[in-house]
A protein has these predicted regions:
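Residue-level marker for buried hydrophobic side chains located in beta-strands
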Residues: 198-200
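Conserved core of the PLP fold type I
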Residues: 62-196
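A composition-driven signal for long, intrinsically disordered, charge-rich low-complexity tracts
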Residues: 6-7, 19, 114, 193
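Generic N-terminal amphipathic, Lys/Arg-enriched alpha-helix
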Residues: 1-9
Length: 200
């Protein structure tokens, strides 16, 4: 068998973490919250079938053709209009899922050795996506009592390390399941804005 030469950066990637989580979720009697897999009973199968049939009946050729790399223009317009703040459709990028979005963020914001800040604990799929670009990761831990981030830790670390961005999950955080209260989100946004720290 041919011994293929892979890029050096792949040596830092841990492809087994997500694979092992998803493998465990297929075992009988296991209800796994780790992989973020929704219950199959919750899928709106009938609604998807109806939408698919309508599109294939009314716009079959457009539906099967490639779209722009930014995503389907009418959908980007709809997303822009649906957001609670003013945004142009030109600033909306559609991806095939969160993993593609995380990979693109890593691709455009991380150089080898650049620093990123992450909420701890954090979503292993994001850490895996970012690791391909070989950043130096530092943690902003949740307070064990309140479950909230310590903004003073974020400020101190940003002033010391100058991270490219701060990654966290504000809704249904994986793995904790916690959602940040609205008033804390406002404090976090103000803190990051003052630090010039983009939030992912």
């Amino acid at each position: 068998m041919k011994d293929w030469q892979f890029a050096t950066r792949t040596q830092a990637m841990d492809s087994l973490a997500v694979h092992e989580m998803l493998k465990m979720s297929g075992l009988p009697g296991i209800i796994s919250f780790a992989g973020g897999l929704p219950s199959p009973e919750s899928f709106p199968v009938e609604a998807f079938n109806a939408a698919y049939e309508k599109v294939m009946r009314e716009h079959p050729r457009n539906a099967l053709q490639y779209s722009s790399s930014e995503g389907y223009e009418p959908l980007r317009q709809w997303v822009a209009q649906s957001l609670p703040w003013e945004v142009s459709p030109e600033h909306v990028l559609l991806t095939t899922g969160s993993q593609q979005a995380l990979d693109l963020i890593g691709k455009v914001l991380i150089d080898e050795g650049s620093r990123i800040a992450v909420q701890t604990p954090s979503y292993v799929g994001a850490l895996q996506a970012f690791s391909a670009y070989q950043p130096v990761v530092y943690s902003i831990p949740n307070d064990p009592e309140s479950g909230l981030l310590q903004l003073s830790d974020l400020e101190e670390n940003q002033l010391r390390y100058a991270a490219r961005f701060f990654y966290l999950l504000s809704n249904f955080q994986n793995p904790s399941g916690q959602s940040l209260p609205a008033e804390f989100r406002e404090q976090l946004a103000k803190t990051c804005d003052a630090l010039g720290l983009p939030v992912v």
